[in-house]
């Protein structure tokens, strides 16, 4: 085996025949792989022709490393060779490496080749061609080719295209990623959430955790139709997407709901809210991350199989529902989670770590909670897990349907801030009375009307 020092020394000798001999395809695969993998940066004038015979080597790793090293040279003389190789190669990773090598040349002669790549059947190959063509911003031929991807049948290609086109067109956000406006911190707003949204700036909150109101489960007059209900939630969660910081999370607790029958001549109807909302959420820009199942004890379930228990007739079985969905989404971003982590100082990351025992599966067994002031409340444990798993200390946690305010209370417990909206005055009053008498939360929050919330944001009272 050649040492790294020996390889580096030979690279600097333009008259050396070392690489022509050392990279002969007759050598053992392990020898070739070691040499190709340790070449590092190649000097100007390096003879890239030594790699060409290896493009037809039977070992796919050797072919891939050979084409990668050709790409380091950024030499147009290899354009035709690489184009032919990319068209004939069967391994996806190696084809992508060849297309990447073509793109690194930054030669306009490569545009027709890369344009042809966009018609490939492999989405990963198309994606690589897209990235390569983005280097030719402003070139009419390249722009025209890229525009064809707007309606590409593969959703990942469409998403990649949209991310690339909008990467430089995002609005400038005044506060940094880890910060939020002081006027939004620890505030309960008693108002219609859709009116409240008109006052909240873009990219203001770090995490949203909420459970929407049930569809007409208790009052038939709340929503005109199930579609109207879904449209309402869609509007709310689209605005939630707008005010969420880049790459941050939205967690939705929902479950199928039963609407009682309107007469003895009709049957009750069950609506699959989380499943009906899912495509709407992904369409508006939320990326699906996880489906967590909240499992409640059987005694907490409404009995739906009493009749079947008595007569055992087929077709009449109805299971007692002991689960609810906790759907986890992330605001789509071209940045990875690592980028989000780097927006915080080391101390914040360290102190926000989840050090206690935690549930490793997506099945969370948690007892339900009750509250005399609200008919449907989050268990503290459920909110605690979500807030710890998907936010840092000092983050702003949002709940557009605050109810009894569990999200806000637990946010404070974990040294986060909260922003809550609740339109029912009696629920807001319940929060104010309960928290105001607690030794844990005295004077740590504001209860504001919509008008006062606007004044709080603008500083004009």
Name the predicted role of every residue range.
Residues 40, 71, 103, 134-135, ...:
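Structural signature of alpha-helical solenoid repeat scaffolds
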Residues 60-100, 112:
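Alpha-helical adaptor scaffolds
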Residues 97, 122-124, 128, 182, ...:
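Core catalytic lobe of class I
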Residues 172-196, 436-461:
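S-adenosyl-L-methionine
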Residues 9-24, 43-56, 75-88, 107-119, ...:
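Amphipathic alpha-helical scaffolding segments comprising HEAT/armadillo-like alpha-solenoid repeats
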Residues 17, 29-33, 37, 49, ...:
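Alpha-solenoid HEAT/ARM repeat scaffold
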Residues 147-174:
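Eukaryotic acidic, Ser/Thr-rich intrinsically disordered low-complexity regions
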Residues 28-30, 45, 60-61, 76, ...:
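Alpha-helix N-cap/helix-start positions at coil->helix boundaries
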